[in-house]
């Protein structure tokens, strides 16, 4: 029984030694809660870069949406003008029979 407990303790110590040899750490003391002088500057800067990218994407989406709305309005106006001209051509034909479109097709 003592032998198995001794082996278990030695195994635990061996695991701790191997685990600690594979990792490393550094403690940096500073006056306040800000990151120390050896902190990763890229990590602090990347959040600002992401915010700028998101602003650009948002502005681009807004511009595309505005242009699509403008294009839709132009298409609707052109369709309305086309329908009005077809109505006028039907009235000029007397309204009897089939409607004639501006290109002469039925």
Curated annotation (Swiss-Prot):
The record marks 38-39 as: Cleavage by prohormone convertase. The modification Alanine amide is found at residue 35. Residues 39-106 form a propeptide. It comes from the Eukaryota. Keywords: Amidation, Cleavage on pair of basic residues, Hormone, Neuropeptide, Pyrrolidone carboxylic acid, Secreted, Signal. One of its GO terms (biological process) is neuropeptide signaling pathway. GO terms for molecular function: hormone activity. InterPro entries: Adipokinetic_hormone_CS, AKH/RPCH_hormone. Only expressed in the head and thorax body segments of adults. Is more expressed in adult males than in females. It is found in: Secreted. One of its GO terms (cellular component) is extracellular region. Residues 1-25 form the signal peptide. The modification Pyrrolidone carboxylic acid is found at residue 26. Neuropeptide with neuromodulator or neurotransmitter role that activates the adipokinetic hormone/corazonin-related peptide receptor (ACPR). May function in regulation of post-ecdysis activities. Does not activate the A.gambiae adipokinetic hormone (AKH) and corazonin (CRZ) receptors. Belongs to the AKH/HRTH/RPCH family. This is Adipokinetic hormone/corazonin-related peptide. It comes from Aedes aegypti.
